[in-house]
Design a protein with these regions (language model features):
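Metal-dependent DNA phosphodiester-chemistry modules and their immediately adjacent helices/loops
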Residues: 1-19, 136-153
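Domain-core and long-helix interface of multi-subunit machines
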Residues: 5-121, 208-243
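Short coil/turn linker and secondary-structure boundary residues
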Residues: 16-21, 52, 143-146, 158-162, ...
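Short amphipathic alpha-helical patches
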Residues: 26-27, 83, 124-125, 138, ...
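Short, compositionally biased low-complexity segments
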Residues: 30-34, 63, 131-152, 178-185, ...
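Phosphate/diphosphate-binding loops
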Residues: 97-109, 114-121, 126-181
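Non-catalytic structural connector segments
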Residues: 110, 160-243
Length: 243
């Protein structure tokens, strides 16, 4: 239920071009949720990138249930913009997050920040990003859904044992911790919202407006058409959508 609440709050009360969840709201409704530290846009990665102290990093990481590291290709733009000098520098950022997780006893998970399924699908994302004004739209990061073997190869610099831990063991542990649930109780239907009294309210509103236009006694053709439309809407459970 907390996940539903947060999604609703984000879209209805905290929409700033994109849905947002304030930290205070997340803390209020955190029970039952598992929260990771995110990609390079997350506060932990950026703090590591800034070279913050270990004390500061631990304070930030304390918020999260697991820490994330990603393939260095995901963050190659940091080399293009001069923030990081080499690929080894990108690996060092991941190594620091791994060391932080080990020290704090938090699982570290290798995630892909997947935006598309196949490598060739990068073309479509580049088109979308170009339309949104990104200067480097054609220099797409390899954000496709990698296989287990590909991820093990990506993180081989951590050593075989640690690579298997972050690529296989810890992701499976997180997945096993997630409750299986259905978003809808029934697999059939259109899942329109339902409000108490919606059927009567819709019918009364329609009749009131019709009488305002045509008078106390509705013409037969109007009454038949009104009945047909209302019966279709109400009969299919869509009354609430029209209010």
């Amino acid at each position: 239920m907390n996940l539903y609440r947060l999604v609703s709050y984000a879209h209805l009360e905290h929409l700033r071009k994109v849905p947002q969840i304030p930290r205070s709201l997340l803390n209020m409704h955190r029970e039952g949720l598992i929260i990771g530290s995110a990609c390079e846009a997350g506060e932990l990665f950026r703090a590591v990138l800034r070279g913050e102290s270990e004390e500061k990093l631990m304070s930030i990481a304390d918020m999260y249930d697991y820490l994330e590291i990603q393939p260095i290709g995901n963050n190659a733009f940091l080399m293009r913009n001069g923030t990081v000098d080499t690929e080894e520098g990108l690996r060092d950022l991941n190594r620091r997050i791994v060391a932080l997780g080990d020290k704090m006893g938090k699982p570290v998970v290798a995630t892909g920040d997947v935006h598309f399924l196949e490598p060739d699908d990068a073309l479509f994302r580049s088109i979308i990003m170009h339309a949104r004004g990104f200067d480097d739209a054609e220099q797409q990061a390899p954000l496709y859904f990698k296989t287990t073997d590909e991820m093990l190869e990506e993180f081989s610099y951590l050593g075989e044992e640690k690579a298997r831990e972050v690529v296989i063991t810890n992701p499976n542990m997180i997945a096993d911790s997630c409750e299986r649930m259905k978003a809808f109780l029934s697999e059939k239907g259109t899942y329109a919202p339902t409000f108490p009294g919606a059927n009567d309210e819709l019918r009364n509103m329609a009749l009131k407006k019709a009488h305002e236009i045509y008078g106390d006694e509705l013409p037969e053709v109007v009454q038949k058409r009104l009945d047909k439309e209302l019966n279709s809407i109400i009969g299919n459970g869509y009354s609430s959508l029209y209010l």
